[in-house]
Regions:
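Alpha-helical solenoid repeat scaffolds
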Residues: 1-280
Length: 280
């Protein structure tokens, strides 16, 4: 698979909205199977290919490509290197490999790597909290707050919850998350604390966050069903898995006594389908 800089820079943007599912799959397979012979492919080529995979939601394939590169020996632009490491960290968050997250964060701190949105600093604080090093985590968090131009209210809310001694504290789900750079960190912090995930996670990155939403028992069933539908459309789960989730929705006997009234009262199309499934 031979690429040149002109093709990458000129045409990748035009491929952003591929309509054909078959063409979409073939394009992803083409990108993820490139020959990474470092003598024939430049750092910029690698960056464009990996960036395109990441933008298309294929974080695992982007991660696997990066893992084939010896990032210490290849002449990679600093900005590109930081982008590669942010993908590695976010993939580990998305797959909930927290021990690997914390190991990578130590390496990145030693290398003085800068990641967007203070992702590395927040990862360090999160890992210190997991390690019960609360005093150090609090100190670093204070420094983080002082350094941020705009306070990250989502991170602070999650961090404060983790520090709380009251395990039954009421927690309002995070909504309107805009930053893809931090959404995987947020999802991991929510999952480790068994807190609900909002539908915003599905909207922001359905390929990588639908499954965590489905598996989150603390998340409301209407959102889990919505995530399951999206995951099924993206070939992430089978029809049997979707059916099993349909069956797990808890409808009352009273709701089955009057189907017309029940259906009119449900404002979620996916829950309506679950109701029909159980009614059949």
């Amino acid at each position: 698979f031979d690429l040149d800089n002109l093709l990458i820079s000129s045409h990748f943007e035009a491929l952003k909205n591929i309509k054909s599912a078959t063409l979409h799959r073939e394009f992803i397979n083409l990108l993820s199977s490139i020959d990474l012979d470092v003598e024939n492919i430049s750092s910029d080529m690698l960056y464009f290919v990996i960036k395109k995979l990441y933008e298309m939601g294929e974080i695992e394939k982007a991660y696997k490509l990066i893992s084939k590169i010896n990032l210490d020996s290849v002449d990679i632009d600093k900005q590109n290197l930081e982008f590669f490491y942010s993908i590695k960290l976010n993939y580990l968050y998305s797959s909930f490999k927290l021990s690997e997250v914390c190991n990578l964060r130590l390496f990145l701190l030693e290398q003085s790597i800068n990641l967007p949105k203070n992702l590395l600093q927040k990862s360090d604080i999160f890992c210190l909290t997991l390690e019960n090093k609360f005093s150090e985590a609090k100190l670093l968090n204070s420094l983080l707050i002082d350094s941020e131009t705009v306070k990250d209210e989502y991170f602070q809310k999650l961090f404060n919850f983790m520090l709380s001694s009251e395990n039954n504290n009421f927690f309002t789900p995070l909504i309107n998350i805009q930053s893809k750079d931090l959404v995987f960190l947020y999802s991991a912090m929510l999952r480790i604390n068994e807190l609900p995930l909002d539908k915003n996670f599905i909207e922001l990155d359905p390929l990588n966050l639908s499954i965590p939403v489905i598996l989150s028992e603390s998340t409301s069933m209407d959102i889990r069903i919505k995530a399951a539908h999206r995951a099924y459309e993206d070939d992430l789960i089978s029809i049997n898995s979707l059916s099993a989730l349909y069956q797990s929705v808890d409808f009352s006997s009273k709701e089955f006594d009057d189907p017309d009234k029940t259906i009119s009262n449900i404002d979620n199309n996916e829950l309506v389908m679950a109701y029909y499934y159980q009614l059949a």
